[in-house]
């Protein structure tokens, strides 16, 4: 592992920012658990669903729990930002052999295969293709794979990061409106219906 080269690279600085942000989030949850133990469980569950399944599940849980846009949207944006700031640099640093950790080899192979198999449109249309790739969630693409494709087609690190995150934030904002409306509509039939909607999203 070449520590100096890692921290001299843009991806190394992104990784540090991601780790600091993740640490602050954990501290925030710890403080919240002390001050507001009941409320913080909802935020922790929403975060966990986002990490394990995706933002659709996390946001659906938030709206089914009665949370507002101001509670749901920023946290899911933060979690997606952490995804990119941690996993994208780990891929790049491992790809360049600046990080040589056996545990990362399978991750790098999987991410490269996913990016290679799904990145045809992005390579053809460049930045516009990357924006669409990240924006459309039903392709099971996501910002992490999108950022890796951006790297593989030669985008500069900070431009790649900006495109991926802005597209992600825009997508989350629009899907938040839709999921909130769906949750409210489902609740008109039965108070448990929003949870059935969440289950459907998880199973899909």
Where are these regions (language model features)?
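Membrane-interface alpha-helices at helix entry/exit sites of multi-pass transporters
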Residues: 70-77, 152-167
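Alpha-helical transmembrane spans of integral membrane proteins, capturing the lipid-embedded, hydrophobic core
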Residues: 22-26, 51, 77-81, 164-173
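Transmembrane alpha-helical segments of multi-pass membrane transport proteins and ion-pumping complexes
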Residues: 55, 59, 80-92, 139, ...
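Membrane-interfacial helix-loop-helix
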Residues: 1-42, 70-136, 180-204
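Transmembrane helix boundary and interhelical junction motifs in multipass membrane proteins
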Residues: 41-67, 137-148
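C-terminal transmembrane helix pair
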Residues: 129, 135, 142-144, 149, ...
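Membrane-helix boundary/interface segments in integral membrane proteins
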Residues: 120-122, 145-154
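Hydrophobic alpha-helical interface/terminus motif in multipass membrane transporters
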Residues: 61-62, 94, 149, 178, ...
């Amino acid at each position: 592992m070449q520590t100096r080269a890692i921290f001299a690279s843009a991806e190394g600085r992104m990784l540090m920012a991601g780790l600091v942000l993740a640490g602050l989030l954990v501290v925030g949850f710890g403080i919240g658990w002390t001050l507001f133990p009941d409320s913080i469980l909802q935020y922790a569950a929403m975060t966990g669903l986002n990490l394990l399944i995706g933002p659709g599940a996390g946001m659906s849980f938030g709206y089914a729990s009665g949370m507002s846009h101001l509670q749901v949207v920023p946290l899911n944006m933060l979690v997606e930002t952490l995804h990119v700031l941690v996993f994208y640099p780990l891929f790049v640093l491992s790809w360049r052999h600046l990080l040589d950790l056996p545990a990362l080899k399978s991750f790098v192979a999987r991410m490269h295969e996913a990016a290679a198999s799904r990145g045809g449109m992005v390579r053809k249309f460049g930045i516009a293709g990357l924006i669409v790739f990240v924006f459309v969630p039903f392709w099971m693409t996501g910002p992490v794979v999108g950022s890796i494709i951006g790297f593989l087609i030669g985008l500069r690190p900070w431009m790649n990061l900006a495109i991926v995150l802005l597209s992600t934030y825009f997508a989350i904002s629009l899907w938040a409106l839709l999921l909130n409306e769906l949750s409210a509509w489902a609740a008109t039939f039965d108070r448990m219906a929003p949870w059935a909607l969440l289950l459907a999203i998880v199973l899909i």
